[in-house]
Amino acid sequence: MDKLHLTFIGTEYSGKRTLGRRVALWRGSKTGNDDLINLPPEACAFHDHFVLPWVVHELGHEYHRGLSEKKILDLNPDLLEHFQRYQFEYHMGSGFAGDDHFLIDWFYADAVYAPLYYGYGAPGSYAARWEYAEHAEERVLQDMPQMILVLIKSRPEVIRDRLSRGESEFPQRHAGSLFKEKDTEFVSDAFQKLFDQSKITRKFEIDTSDASVDESLDEFISK
């Protein structure tokens, strides 16, 4: 079976991580990958460590994850920028090109959240994140041409309702979130724009507003 390079993007509470776990289990069943088949209940196997404060890949890093994700917010914006850039660049390395590679948000989220919440990356500034995303995609197309980009989205009123009710299979994933309800439309529109402008040609959207997780998984598989 061909390798699968996959990036999910979208606002918080759109269902990226929930669907990501189901996709990983499905992929494991197709490839016989025991690491995916036997995922612990709290894990999704995607690299989901690119949005502050959740900057530690959960599998194999439990011993320092809590402290690291608490201390990361003590860094000044310049150091945060350096750290995030290291994470993005690391996952462009050749070591990830040969096997399945699953990511959530990757460098895309910084284009949305860094100017809004982190204190760096605004358009026209040093390390402007929107421009960085454009250049990063050029490298992805060169080194990982089979990458699939998926926008996971929901209507703003659905996002706000899930947020207010804390509706998530991964409540710990949303603890300490910097995402604000008042920013729902702005963030949703920004991810949509990133998706629409993306140079990645293998891309599609999944709207989870009215769909069950199983229905969203079926839609993913069908595409």
Give each language-model segment a name:
Residues 14:
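ATP-binding Walker
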Residues 21-96, 112-116:
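Conserved substrate/cofactor phosphate-moiety recognition/catalytic segment
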Residues 17:
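Walker A/P-loop
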Residues 97-101, 146-148:
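Loop/turn-to-beta-strand initiation segments
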Residues 164-223:
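NTP-dependent small-molecule kinase module
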Residues 8:
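Hydrophobic anchor at the beta1->P-loop junction of P-loop NTPases
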Residues 113-190:
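A glycine- and Lys/Arg-enriched "phosphate-lid" helix/loop adjacent to the NTP-binding pocket
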Residues 11:
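P-loop (Walker A) phosphate-binding loop of NTP-binding proteins
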